[in-house]
From Swiss-Prot:
Entry EC number(s): 2.3.1.225
Domain of life of the native organism: Eukaryota
Role: Palmitoyltransferase that catalyzes the addition of palmitate onto various protein substrates, such as CGAS, HRAS and LCK.
Organism classification: Eukaryota, Metazoa, Chordata, Craniata, Vertebrata
Gene that specifies this protein: zdhhc18a
Protein name: Palmitoyltransferase ZDHHC18-A
Length: 467
């Protein structure tokens, strides 16, 4: 009589059809795929141009309006006002206007096209580690663990919040922009006029833009008034001067309605720079004096000149998203599958619960079941089963649903039904209609510690539900 040969199956080695297909692709086919750059798979809501060299927010429709107003006003000024002022005043007027115009355009483009300081999102492994740390730090109650951390900056407690989108704790002074869907370092605000967020890497360009635009607008506004005043002094009157130079009226209207907001914005950001604050912190009142002396700004140097140098003249931090870098090819095979690829019974992490349920099952089976010990044809040999013999002979494995096995013993697992008393057969049949994992106890003599778990739902076998 020849005993059946069994092959142990490692449930971690199971693969879904999709993962098996992707891992067995020929090398030539993978090598023929074009390498993609990181900006092509960037998760944020940004637009990239010139092969990732230029980045803008998706809602950048106001940026053309900003550029258009600057260009229209400047072109009208250099075309209709500068010739008259050069003849009656000095040739330095167009030179000064040209320098200011170039400075405004360059600073605007740098603000719009520069990475504001976007932080890359956490990788799956990093996110899993952070979630594990959060779960371990939680209490034994049903309340969820806190999603905040506290750190000390200049002897002052600063709270770090968890970003559910980027799956990480935000560094100090970092905030998540809802329009760009990115976490930005030293987040100031999202400016639709420049079509980008204003943060750590482009704040100096933004400040230079609004200050230079204030000077340019004030300069054009003063030159236009001077032009119309000189024309009206010739005896024709102010109305005639407007009729002689209608473009000056357009410039006057644009500058009049924009100069107040631009000057106010420049003054507000000058105060922020001198205090080493951000617009986001000022609006929220994070370091307001109303909260007491202990809630003062921990980032200030208590010196206006030092704060200005740190904010505007500090070293330019590098971009962390590497938008023009290549996405690494996924050539390395995955040796360990994720929980999504494993059966539901094996995806559980609570091993204590599984061990406890198996122990109770074995104790109940020791008092009510008899297992057939061989698979050779003929009269089956039965023997009473004790708890010790079950612990040494039971092999529990997990396998996908398959057809009923044959009675052959060559290299296949021989399965035999379990002789169950009639009083329990009704319970076993009722359990077949439930959506619970089932256990089948085959006959090979293996220890429980060396054999993996396998699920089977063959209709002709005896099953016991796992409660």
């Amino acid at each position: 009589m020849k005993n059946c040969e069994y092959q142990q199956i490692d449930p971690r080695a199971l693969r879904t059809p999709s993962s098996r297909t992707s891992s067995t692709l020929p090398c030539g086919r993978k090598g023929s795929q074009r390498l993609r750059r990181k900006w092509e798979v960037f998760p944020g809501k940004n637009r990239f141009y010139c092969d990732g060299r230029i980045m803008l927010a998706r809602q950048c429709g106001v940026l053309p309006l900003t550029i258009g107003l600057i260009f229209i006003t400047s072109v009208l000024f250099f075309t209709f006002d500068c010739p008259f002022l050069v003849d009656h005043l000095t040739v330095f007027i167009p030179v000064i206007g040209g320098v200011l115009f170039i400075f405004v355009v360059i600073s605007l483009l740098q603000t719009s096209f520069t990475d504001p300081g976007i932080l890359p999102r956490a990788l799956p492994d990093e996110a899993a580690d952070i979630e594990k740390q959060i779960d371990n730090s939680g209490s034994s109650t049903y309340r969820p663990p806190p999603r905040t951390k506290e750190i000390l900056i200049n002897d002052q407690v600063v709270k770090l919040k968890y970003c559910f989108t980027c799956k990480m704790f935000r560094p100090p002074r970092t905030s998540h922009c809802s329009l760009c869907d990115n976490c930005v370092e030293r987040f100031d605000h999202h400016c639709p006029w420049v079509g980008n967020c204003v943060g750590k890497r482009n704040y100096r360009f933004f400040y230079a833009f609004i200050v230079s635009l204030s000077f340019l607008t004030s300069f054009i506004f003063g030159c236009v008034i001077t032009h119309l005043t000189l024309r009206s002094q010739g005896g024709n009157g102010f109305i005639q001067a407007i009729q002689d130079s209608p473009a000056s009226v357009v410039e006057l209207v644009i500058c009049f309605f924009s100069i107040w907001s631009i000057l106010g914005l420049s003054g507000f950001h000058t105060y922020l720079v001198a205090s080493n604050l951000t617009t986001n912190e000022d609006i929220k009142g994070s370091w307001s004096s109303k909260r007491g002396e202990e809630s003062g700004n921990p980032y200030t140097y208590n010196n206006i000149f030092t704060n200005c140098c740190v904010v505007l003249c500090g070293p330019m931090p590098p971009s962390l998203i590497d938008r023009r870098g290549f996405v690494p090819p996924e050539d390395a095979p995955q040796t360990v599958t994720s929980d999504a690829e494993l059966p539901a019974f094996m995806a559980k992490n609570d091993t204590n619960m599984c061990a406890q349920g198996t122990k109770e099952l074995l104790e109940s089976m020791a008092n009510s079941t008899v297992i057939q010990s061989t698979c050779a044809p003929g009269k089956p040999k039965t023997a009473p089963v004790t708890q010790e013999s079950l612990l040494n002979t039971v092999s529990i494995t997990v396998s996908p649903p398959s057809k009923p096995p044959s009675n052959g013993c060559s290299g296949r697992q021989a399965r035999r039904p379990i002789d169950v008393p009639c009083s329990q057969r009704g319970l076993k049949r009722a359990a077949l209609h439930t959506h619970k994992p089932m256990l089948r106890l085959p006959s090979p003599l293996y220890s429980l510690s060396d054999s993996p778990l396998i699920l089977s739902d063959a209709p002709d076998m005896g099953f016991i539900p796992l409660n």
